[in-house]
């Protein structure tokens, strides 16, 4: 049976900062355990391709398949935990989910007041970053806390508000998913077409661009829907060699991203790419 290279792929995917985070926290373990895990980590990290036989030899674990498998599995789970914790501390999207998880635990332990504090933290982050799917769970947990509150009057006053809040974010999420599907359709057409200038290919692109959601910008009900609306049209009309329309949509995409400050929420790469596409169209 071919040895799994999952651990190798995970280590190779790690950034310098993630590796430092792992090393610092691993050194806090007992000396023997820390030495084993770091030795295996270093042995795998030094490889260009995964060669389990040479790694076992380097670790002095030739013929100890079961023990080596346990060490690999422990290191993999440990790395995944460290990477997750690192991103929970550095990325707001992860923090929102972590706060919601904490709120769920506190609510299950019948500590609604404490749970509410973490729901508010999660909600603030998710709303700021337009995390619609996260907000569905956050609003639901918030409604549960109010529902089980002894303050019946307060629950009665907020019942409609919570329902409408949940309904609005579900609608935004579904609307965004429709635009994502259209984006996937366009990408699939591009990937499976040898000659995009061929009349048949142009007809396929045109058919996608004639979808009702792509004909009216007011149909895009969320920030990400607006981004997809302009992205799809910008690319589509570029393929159809309609540079005026392509430029218009790409310029609008830049304006949307900049006005919503999405470039500060982990989208700097997308923003720079959009600026490049706009420049190419303009030239």
Question: Where on the chain are the PLM-derived regions?
Answer:
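Intrinsically disordered, low-complexity protein-interaction/activation regions
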Residues: 1-111, 147
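Short helix-adjacent coil turns
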Residues: 17, 63, 106-117, 126-133, ...
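Helix-turn-helix repeat elements of alpha-solenoid scaffolds
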Residues: 73-77, 110-120, 153-163, 194-213, ...
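Flexible helix-coil transition and linker loops at the boundaries of alpha-helical arrays
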Residues: 86-90, 125-129, 170-174, 211-223, ...
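Residues that mark the junctions of alpha-helical repeat units in TPR/alpha-solenoid scaffolds
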Residues: 88, 95, 135, 219-226, ...
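TPR repeat positional signature
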Residues: 92, 99, 118, 134-135, ...
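Tandem amphipathic alpha-helical repeat scaffolds
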Residues: 102-108, 140-149, 181-198, 227-242, ...
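Short, charge-rich amphipathic alpha-helical segments embedded
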Residues: 122-151, 257, 262-266
């Amino acid at each position: 049976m071919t040895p799994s290279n999952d651990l190798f792929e995970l280590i190779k995917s790690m950034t310098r900062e993630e590796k430092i985070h792992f090393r610092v926290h691993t050194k806090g373990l007992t000396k023997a355990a820390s030495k084993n895990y770091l030795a295996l980590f270093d042995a795998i990290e030094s490889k260009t391709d995964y060669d389990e036989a040479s790694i076992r030899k380097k670790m002095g674990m030739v013929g100890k398949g079961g023990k080596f498998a346990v060490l690999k599995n422990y290191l993999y789970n440990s790395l995944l935990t460290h990477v997750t914790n690192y991103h929970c501390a550095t990325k707001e999207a992860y923090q929102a989910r972590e706060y919601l998880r904490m709120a769920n635990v506190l609510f299950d332990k019948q500590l609604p007041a404490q749970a509410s504090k973490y729901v508010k933290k999660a909600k603030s982050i998710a709303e700021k970053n337009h995390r619609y799917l996260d907000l569905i769970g956050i609003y639901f947990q918030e409604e549960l806390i109010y529902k089980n509150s002894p303050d019946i009057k307060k629950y009665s006053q907020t019942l409609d508000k919570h329902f409408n809040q949940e309904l609005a974010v579900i609608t935004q999420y579904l609307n965004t998913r429709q635009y994502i599907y259209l984006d996937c359709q366009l990408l699939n057409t591009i990937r499976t077409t040898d000659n995009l200038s061929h009349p048949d290919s142009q007809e396929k692109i045109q058919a996608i661009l004639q979808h009702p959601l792509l004909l009216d910008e007011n149909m895009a009900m969320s920030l990400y829907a607006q981004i997809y609306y302009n992205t799809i049209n910008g690319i589509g009309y570029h393929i159809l060699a309609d540079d005026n329309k392509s430029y218009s949509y790409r310029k609008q995409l830049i304006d949307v991203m900049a006005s919503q400050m999405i470039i500060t929420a982990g989208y700097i790469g997308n923003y720079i790419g959009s600026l490049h596409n706009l420049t190419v169209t303009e030239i």
